[in-house]
Amino acid sequence: MPLCEKGNDPIDSSTIDSLCAAFDKTLKSTPDVQKYNDAINTIFQLRQKSESGKMPADLTNSEALKDRQKIEEILTRSYQDHSESRVHLSKLIQNDIPFALNLFEILSRSSIHVFVGCFSNKDATIALLNELQIRIHYGEDTHVTYLLSIILQLLNKFKYNFKEVRFLVKELILRISEDEVKSMMLIIFAELQSSFQKDFDKAVVDFMSSLIVEAEIDVGNDPLSIIVKTLSELYPSLTTLCSEIFLTKGLSKLFKKRVFEEQDLQFTKELLRLLSSACIDETMRTYITENYLQLLERSLNVEDVQIYSALVLVKTWSFTKLTCINLKQLSEIFINAISRRIMPKIENVNESAVKLEEVPKVEMSVEALAYLSLKASVKIMIRSNESFTEILLTMIKSQKMTHCLYGLLVIMANLSTLPEESNGSSQSINDLKNYADLKGPGADKVGAEKESKEDILLFNEKYILRTELISFLKREMHNLSPNCKQQVVRVIYNITRSKNFIPQCISQGGTTIILEYLANKQDIGEPIRILGCRALTRMLIFTNPGLIFKKYSALNAIPFLFELLPRSTPVDDNPLHNDEQIKLTDNYEALLALTNLASSETSDGEEVCKHIVSTKVYWSTIENLMLDENVPLQRSTLELISNMMSHPLTIAAKFFNLENPQSLRNFNILVKLLQLSDVESQRAVAAIFANIATTIPLIAKELLTKKELIENAIQVFADQIDDIELRQRLLMLFFGLFEVIPDNGTNEVYPLLQENQKLKDALNMSLKRGDSGPEFSAAIPVILAKIKV
């Protein structure tokens, strides 16, 4: 059907409609290439209606472009389906770049790859870059996000000389006040710095220097605000470069003149935002404290900028230098800002009705309290404020507060941290590096107070467990950022420090959260991973594995437990290996957790044993720990092996396949370990031998001839007969061995056992004592009946 455009010649859209109709049908082959070219030609006929490539509004809203989805589908399929139609489309685009831009930018962002793909080499894009520069410079094109997305794809696809893209530095900085430009600028600048670091840095410094000159002679379009806004945005990604510019001679003087002499409140806000961003640099924190403290303290008395200045004071972490406010008063500014003025408005009205200036104040207050809640005095203050704590929980669960969620979770993680956990391995997490890589806040002890462990436990029970916060976070985990997930792990870790809280933590999904978090390995090299592994070990130590592993198999936990164990050589799959923050306690608790898993009477227990034994790096770790010089570690390893013997067929080959050199080595080690000075370790070793002797007769038969084993066992049995548990295990070993000795009447004699007076005397002594227990005492006469001395 022909379309008429305001008295002009009609445009026949039938080619567009018929091709789209063909797309809707299931065809064994794509339509003929000519149909694609005809449809493209129809679309590009619209340029006849435009002036200098500018598509007028009446044409943009015309019937021909009413269904933009059809237009986009034709352009995309023409690019994808036939090389001939791709060439034709590319030619039309390159012949009239202004019109092509106007056409494509009214389509969805997914069409960008088609547009950029129509330029096969860098030289072909130079005209496009020139057109883009013009449009960005004049700012008349309302589709700036689309234009900048094209630039980003061009930078990724082609290797330009910096001179060809240098214009981006100036043009984007000059439009820093526009939100659409600001967000894309950060991505584009990151790409430019990656490809042209030296040239890019120089271009930024040079242009910012020119803006400083303009500010000094008071010309240009508010160059000082442009400088402040640009530095604020670039500081997180280009910290060193921004600090170099910030420290430019004379710039501080210009800033202070604008604030104090001209009393420009809006500029003061912008400057305070910059100071807040600059605190990411330790050098700048010192500089700000030394040069801007007067500004910061005076700004505390101006309501509109009070929170802005208070946040900077917090982030400089220089509380000893404050003269007009103390730590408690500083904290109250943010608590009051949320609980009295801001939070009620956000919760009680539609999000669209909230004043724009209130949302940043919420964000800043949360950020400040995330820092301040590292301080014991502030934590005590917040925990004692029941209504404010409930507000924090409401904010966490509010769909309107997702932009603050990371800071809120940091606060809850800090509040739930027990006093003994405030230092050591968790300190590197408490530095809130995801905000500003703040270094060494713990060095300042101002405001330090002693926290009560009992108060923290009450807080954790009331505000985390009873409110089912962990259940809520489990449901939301798939929506959370990696940084937020780390703070969830911290909260769960803190809860698992109390044995009594572990069942509730597990029932709310704590184990699932930790397993899924660790499995994603988004935190390789991060200290937070240690906390995740520690939380898992605590849950596994104090809980029946059968009650935990319903959604997942117990096998899923094994890799993370072994991450806490020392290995002889570093391996890629252990992101924590050789990490100095892994303590002996971590090793010990990981072994206890493995022991609990291995001792499960369900099929999971046997599968755990099989997995450990069959995984070379895991078993190598166990073998090394058997000989560890640390007694608790060695003991726990032997107890793990002893528990694994409840599934003897799984592990027998590792110790009792005596034809295998490594197995024989392990066997000989076990024999010697029977004489360890640590009695609990001896019990574990004795249990290993007792278990194998009473469950696998073929192995028991072979053990009858092992002189060192029998001599050591009898020696320990006789010398340490007072230890009932050790005696019981050795009795079962002897019972298993004597069970496989043939009855009288055969020529088969085993003098090591049957003609051993020392063993006979010790057995009689055990029988006489009468404290071995009915089952074990009943075995003694059976053994004595086969002794021939």
From Swiss-Prot:
One of its GO terms (molecular function) is Hsp90 protein binding. It comes from the Eukaryota. It is found in: Cytoplasm. Keywords: Cytoplasm, Phosphoprotein. GO terms for biological process: actin cytoskeleton organization; chaperone-mediated protein folding; intracellular mRNA localization; mating type switching. The keyword Membrane does not apply. The modification Phosphoserine is found at S18. InterPro entries: ARM-like, ARM-type_fold, UCS_central_dom. One of its GO terms (cellular component) is cytoplasm. Signal peptide: none annotated. SUPFAM superfamilies: ARM repeat. Present with 3410 molecules/cell in log phase SD medium. Required for mother cell-specific ho expression. Might be required for the transport of factors (such as ASH1) that promote HO repression from the mother cell into its bud. This is SWI5-dependent HO expression protein 4. The gene is SHE4.
